[in-house]
Design a protein with these regions (language model features):
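Glycine-/small-residue-rich "gating" segment that lines the acyl/pantetheine channel
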Residues: 122-129, 170, 174, 191-247, ...
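Phosphate/pyrophosphate-binding loops at sites that engage ATP/ADP/AMP, CoA/4′-phosphopantetheine
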Residues: 82-96, 245-252, 282-298, 320-324
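Conserved beta-ketoacyl condensing-enzyme motif
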Residues: 8, 23, 29-160, 189-198, ...
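Active-site-proximal alpha-helical scaffold in enzymes
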Residues: 75-87, 138-142, 146-149, 154-190, ...
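Acyl-CoA/ACP chain-elongation machinery
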Residues: 180-226, 259-273, 303-310, 327-377
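Condensing-enzyme catalytic core mediating Claisen C-C bond formation in acyl metabolism
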Residues: 5-9, 32, 36-37, 212-289, ...
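Active-site pocket-shaping loop/turn-to-helix segments
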Residues: 13-16, 62-80, 128-137, 155-170, ...
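ACP-dependent fatty acid/polyketide chain-elongation machinery
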Residues: 1-64, 243-255, 350-364, 408-412
Length: 412
């Protein structure tokens, strides 16, 4: 029995380098970072991928905004952009049972939680907004998307740290294969630029303390990398059953072919020294996609710009692909838009779909110093045209969570 196939027909990124498909893609082609100076107060972090031009009142009424944390705003608007890109019709007045939502976030409504805690300290319990409960819980992403657009199919928000966005795409594939729905809005959103979040990560010394130009702070695979740079934003993808997409003449960017998720069961912040679980995640995603390792044409690496992660991921990729790892491009793209935690995997899935659609490999920007432990073709600083048929995208998160998706060129 043939499997139902899932394709990407809509893309809606919201990042510090641009909102919407073409603004985002043009910023990628410009090969410049969106990371800027950021005041973290008493902490040593001085850079972030902050979205400075965000105006939620452009999209929501004042009454609606009272129920939306910043991360949920990103979720709903990115979904709107993706649905418009896919040219899918929707209506709250005519709910659809065969459209679902699969979303991811690491921290959920942490912005509103911190804001309201400070209000509580100043004004007591009566100073706290009565809508706080519906603003802070992690499931508000998919719930608000479903409410906004009338989607009554399968719906969930996962919280798998930095792998959350990739998990949302992979679970969307499963929803379609298993015939739960015909269309899924899949993505991730995060708004973590709060004192409590930055402080928590800065204290354990995982974040960059780059003292110079903040645009250069995130430098995946570079010898001088000194930690990840936190960002905010989101991305949604419309993932649709193939024949459903064809029946309405939709433009198909890419096909979602394979997915895997597992756990290290080792340490909350350090990967397994031998990379066993990340290796298995990549191999199982390839098996799910029914591909051999040598069929992969490009890997969008997790490449968080930490010393340990980038070198460990390099070793794992070489273990999975063997000699083929030296023949293909492997770039880390967080130098553009930083690391918006649970949103990142969705942003990078969107980027990979566009790479397949436009046949162009995005570069690793801010790369100046070769690291012998990261001895792959990292596409330094400048992207290139390439014949791309199959792409792998990795997300490896705190808690030892490893997720991988494989995308393919749009079927003819």
């Amino acid at each position: 029995m043939s499997r139902r196939r899932a394709v990407i027909t809509g893309i809606g990124p919201i990042t510090c380098i641009g909102h919407g498909r073409e603004n985002f893609w043009n910023a990628i082609l410009a090969e410049k970072s969106g990371i800027k100076s950021f005041d973290s107060g008493v902490f040593r972090v001085r850079a972030a991928g902050e979205i400075n031009d965000w105006d939620p009142e452009q999209f929501f009424s004042p009454q609606r905004l009272k129920r939306l944390d910043r991360y949920a705003q990103f979720a709903v608007v990115s979904a709107k952009l993706a649905l418009e890109d896919a040219r899918l019709e929707y209506s709250r007045e005519k709910p659809q049972d065969r459209v679902g939502v699969s979303f991811g976030t690491a921290l959920g409504g942490v912005c509103k939680a911190e804001e309201q805690y400070l209000r509580y300290l100043k004004k007591g319990a009566r100073g706290v907004q009565p809508t706080l409960a519906v603003q802070v819980f992690g499931g508000s992403a998919h719930s608000n998307i479903a409410i906004e657009f009338g989607f009554r199919g399968a719906g969930t928000t996962n919280s798998n740290s930095c792998a959350s966005g990739t998990v949302s795409v992979g679970e969307a594939l499963r929803y379609i294969r298993d015939d739960f729905v015909d269309v899924v809005v899949a993505g991730g959103a995060e708004a973590p630029l709060t004192t409590i979040t930055i402080g928590a990560f800065d204290i354990i010394k995982t974040m960059s303390r780059w003292p110079e130009n903040p645009a250069l702070a995130c430098r995946p695979f570079d010898l001088l990398r000194d930690g990840f740079v936190m960002g905010e934003g989101g991305a949604s993808l419309v993932i649709e059953e193939l024949e459903h997409a064809r029946s309405r003449g939709a433009h198909i960017y890419a096909e979602v072919l394979g997915y895997s998720i597992n756990n290290d069961a080792f340490h909350m912040t350090s990967p397994l020294p031998n990379g066993e679980s990340s290796i298995r995640a990549m191999r199982e995603a390839l098996t799910d996609a029914q591909l051999a390792p040598e069929q992969i044409d490009y890997i969008n690496a997790h490449a968080s710009s930490t010393q340990l992660n980038d070198s460990a991921e390099t070793a794992s990729i070489k273990q999975v692909l063997g000699n083929h790892a030296q023949r293909i491009p492997v770039s880390g793209t967080k130098g553009y838009y930083a690391h918006p935690l649970g949103a990142t995997g969705a942003i990078e899935a969107a980027l990979c779909a566009l790479a397949l659609d436009r046949q162009w490999v995005p570069p690793t920007i801010n790369y100046t110093n070769h690291d012998p432990l990261c001895d792959l073709d990292v596409v330094p600083n400048h992207g290139r045209e390439a014949e791309l048929t199959y792409i792998m995208s990795n997300s490896f998160g705190f808690g030892g969570i490893n997720a991988c998706v494989v995308l393919g060129k749009a079927p003819q």
